[in-house]
Amino acid sequence: MNAITVLLKTEHIAAVCLLVFGLTRAGAQAAQAADHLPGYQAISMKDDLAHRSPDIHWPAGFEPEKADLFAHNDLIINASCERVWTHIIAAKRWPTWYPNSKDVEIQGGDPVLRDATVFRWTTFGLAIESKVHEYVLNQRLGWYGYAPGAEPTFYHSWYLEPEGTMCHVVMDEAGVGKDVASLRKSDETLMHRGHDLWLATLKWMAEQK
C-alpha cells in the first residue's frame, strides 16, 4: 500500500489531495467540489498571517506582513526532528511521496539539499528554480523560488522544533510581485492547501517504522 492510498483513507487529506490535483490538472470545478467535503476548512491569508511563526528568519523583501501572498502550515510528527529532516532534504525523492512535486534535479547531481544548493523542480504545475539560502542541520531550511533566470518571487522556509520524542514542523512561505498578487486574487488558499498535503505526506513517511 503506497502513501497516497493510505492518505486517501482520511476525509481531510482526501479533500486536500483533490484540491491540489483539481487545481493543477482539472481546474476550479474539482476544487469547488472538494471544498464541500466533510472535515475540510478553508484558511485565508489573514488567518495564516495571524498564526505565522515568530521563529522564521525572513530575508529582506520577503517579510510576511509585506508579502503579496503568504501561507503558514504546521504539524506535529511522531518522529524525531532528525528523522523528519532526512526526508525534507532528500529532494530527489520528493515525487515518490509528495504528489505536488516532480522532475526534481539538483545542480551537481547531489541527491540531497545542502547549503547554497540550486535545484529545479515542478510544483503547482510550474517549472521553477530554487536556491537554498538558510541551512541549519536538523532545524532550519529556507530557499528562494523563481522562474529560471528571473529574480526570486518566493521564499520557502522550514523550521523544526523538538517536542519530547516528536517534532513540530513549521512551513511558512511568502511571495511577492504582480504575478503572485494575481494568484492571491484568483485562489488565495492554493499554497496553503498544497502545503497541507506536503506536511501530511511528510508525516506519513517519517512515522513509518
Predicted regions and their residues:
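Hydrophobic/aromatic beta-strand elements that line small-molecule binding cavities or substrate pockets
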Residues: 73-75, 128-134, 145, 154-162
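Hydrophobic ligand-binding cavity/cleft-lining segments
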Residues: 28-108
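C-terminal segment of classical bacterial N-terminal signal peptides
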Residues: 21-29
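Short beta-strand segments that buttress and anchor functional surface loops
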Residues: 61, 116-124, 142-148
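Bacterial N-terminal signal peptides that target proteins for export
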Residues: 2-14
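Short beta-edge strand/loop motif at the mouth of beta-sheet-based domains
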Residues: 92-127, 138
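A short, structured loop/turn motif at beta-sheet edges
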Residues: 78-82, 133-138, 159-168, 208-209
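Beta-strand/loop substructures that line and gate deep hydrophobic ligand-binding cavities in soluble
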Residues: 36, 146-204
